[in-house]
Each structure stands twice: as C-alpha cells, then as structure tokens.
Amino acid sequence: MSMTLSENRGPNRLAFLRAAFRRPAGAIAGGYIVLLILGAVFAPLLTPYAYDVQSLKDAFQPPSAAHLLGTDEFGRDLLTRLLYGARTSLSVSSISILISVMAGMTLGAAAGYFGGFFDRAVTAVADLTWSFPEILIALILVAIIGPGVSGTMAAIAVAYLAQFARLTRAQIMMLKGETFIEASRSLGSGHAHIIFRHLLPNALAPVLVSAMLATGDAIILEATLGFFGLGAQPPTPSWGAMMSSGSALLFKAPWIIIFPGLAVATTVIAINLFGDALIAALDIRDRLRRDE
C-alpha cells in the first residue's frame, strides 16, 4: 500500500510544469524563454553576419534595415552578437545552476538522511556560505581560478551550492519519516535506493522551482562578471561584456548598451514570471494532495 503511494506520486511529479504553462503569465514567459533558446541555438541561420568579423567602415551604424539593432564600435552587427551572446549567458547560467543543483541535492540529501556529524558539517558550511552575497563569492573564486567561461561557471555553481543543499536537506528531513519510506526500508532497501529512488524524486519539485529562479539571478551574475571583464573573453560575445563596451558610448551610440541591457532585463523577468507560475502550480498541487 505504501509502495503504491510512492509509485502514484511519480507520474504526477512534474505535472505542475504543464499547469504552469496553462497560466497566462507562465505561458507568455515560457514562450519567450523557448524563443530565446531557439534564437541562440539557431543563430547562424537567423543572421547573415559573423559575430567576430570587424568592419570599421560600418561602425556606430544606428538600427536600420541592414542592421536591425545597429552596429557596435567595431562595425559588428549587434543583433548577431546579441543572439550569440544569449548562447553564452544562457549556457553559462543554466549549466552552472545544473551543477549546483546536482551537487547541492547530493550533499543535502546525504546530510538530511544520515544526520550526525556529516549533517552538522554540511549545515555549518552552508550557513557560512549563505551569509555572503553570491557576487562576493563569485568575485573571489574568479580571482582565484581566473577569468573566462570555465571560471565563471565554477564561481556561479559554488555561489548557489548552499541554497540547494539547504533546501534539499529540509525536504529530506520532512520526507524521510513518511510511511512509504518506512515500508521501503522494511523491505530491505538500501540507503542509496531509498535516497535516489524515493526521497530525491519527491523532493525535486521545490528544488526545480528554486533552480528556475536561481537561473535568473545567475544570468545577472554572469552579466556582472562579464561587465567587469571577468566572464567570457573576446571575441566570445556575452551580454555583460556588450554592456561594458557600450557604457563608454552611451551618448554616442546608446543602442550598444540599451539592447543587451534589455535582453538581460526581459530574460530575467521572464524567468521570474515562469518561476512564479511554477510556485503557484506547485501550491495548488500540494493543496490538492492535502485535501485527498
């Protein structure tokens, strides 16, 4: 009976994702995110220009039919660099958060399940890390590792590790006393089977929502590091680096900084709106489960 309870939760585990897309704000925000990802992936097919080819005679061209978003100080098409910059910003932020989620969930699950000294150690380190702003942690790590995509990804992953470890630990502490866990244990299931087959899948939904919201913060963090020259290095475009080069040309060619800034702002807003839709869908799911 208890095992049946565990299995019944499985098929509906990610049903709240579909529920989020049924909400108007979730559908609009989710649609924007999907279009942005498609634009980044198929950038070579959407623009005839190369992101790294300079043409000084075309420098500082305002938005026109030939260059929809204008050109930068080196004559490079801004729309092209914006699309390729989306590749950098989205991939760095999403992969970093994915690494952070995987590591944080593993540590948090082990700490919450086994308890004892390991739990106290993980909690102490997580609390210490949690007390510092993510940007400070990222700046310190990038200074140690060095600038570039790899350093930025490592810095962002470590900066958000404590968030997912704490959240997962709390979920595991709440779930490990459930009847289906006791039933699985009484049937002779090992610790690894219980953690990875029963506990982590049922703790995934709130972690997924938190990861979605953290991805928006990670995009801002990646753009900040790029603005200071600590992110992706030239000629690889990134939204932060584009804003950095455009900041000195605000009055001469404002479009160079405006469009990357709008890209960051609209993307983060869309991610947050979709995250809010996920939270609302998750609340409804939990309320229905409590009423059963």
Where do the protein language model's features map onto the residues?
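C-terminal transmembrane helix and the adjacent membrane-cytosol boundary/short C-terminal tail
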Residues: 159, 205-215, 254-292
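Glycine-rich helix-loop "coupling/hinge" segments at transmembrane-helix boundaries
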Residues: 141-145, 171-172, 213, 221-264, ...
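Generic hydrophobic transmembrane alpha-helix motif, especially the helices
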Residues: 68, 72, 78, 102-104, ...
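Transmembrane alpha-helix signature in integral membrane proteins
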Residues: 78-113
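Transmembrane alpha-helical segments of polytopic membrane transport and secretion proteins
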Residues: 1-31, 273-292
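Hydrophobic alpha-helical transmembrane segments of membrane transport/permease proteins
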Residues: 2, 31, 35, 39-74, ...
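Membrane-water interface segments at the C-terminal ends of transmembrane alpha-helices
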Residues: 31-50, 85, 124-147, 157, ...
